């Protein structure tokens, strides 16, 4: 993939999110369609950063998809080889600076109306500021429009 993140057979993914949240689709099918193993995380565990961290380490999770707010509450210790995919909200620079060193970390963007995500960033780099939304996925396009639905110039 152009992003540098490619699901692969044998990876261990988590299913942390409610089925009502579109990120759950990425979690489930990202693992299952690529020959991975899906760890279904109980709601009681997702609500406890310490318990979630312990599960991630014990299950040797390879791919973790989380909101930046949730991952900001987790320790990186023991998760050095875990690929992190953030989405669902803007990802602040502090989260990138904490989680990007030494690992694949990408940002997905897409309103629920797009049924998951429409863009993915290149691998994020510490010290580069807030995470960009990246480039459109194949067969998609992104446009920035003004209040009258007219295209705005680059950089606006």
Model-flagged regions — what are they?
Residues 1-154:
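Motif- and composition-driven signal specific to adenylation
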């Amino acid at each position: 993939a152009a992003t540098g993140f490619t699901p692969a057979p044998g990876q261990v993914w988590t299913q942390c999110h409610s089925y009502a949240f579109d990120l759950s689709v990425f979690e489930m099918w990202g693992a299952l369609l690529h020959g991975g193993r899906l760890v279904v995380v109980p709601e009681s565990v997702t609500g406890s950063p310490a318990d979630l961290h312990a599960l991630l380490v014990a299950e040797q999770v390879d791919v973790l998809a989380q909101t930046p707010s949730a991952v900001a509450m987790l320790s990186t210790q023991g998760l050095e080889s875990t690929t992190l995919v953030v989405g669902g909200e803007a990802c602040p620079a502090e989260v990138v600076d904490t989680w990007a060193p030494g690992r694949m970390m990408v940002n997905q963007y897409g309103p629920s109306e797009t049924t998951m995500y429409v863009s993915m960033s290149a691998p994020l780099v510490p010290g580069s500021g807030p995470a960009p939304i990246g480039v459109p996925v194949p067969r998609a396009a992104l446009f920035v429009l003004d209040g009258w639905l007219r295209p705005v110039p680059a950089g606006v």
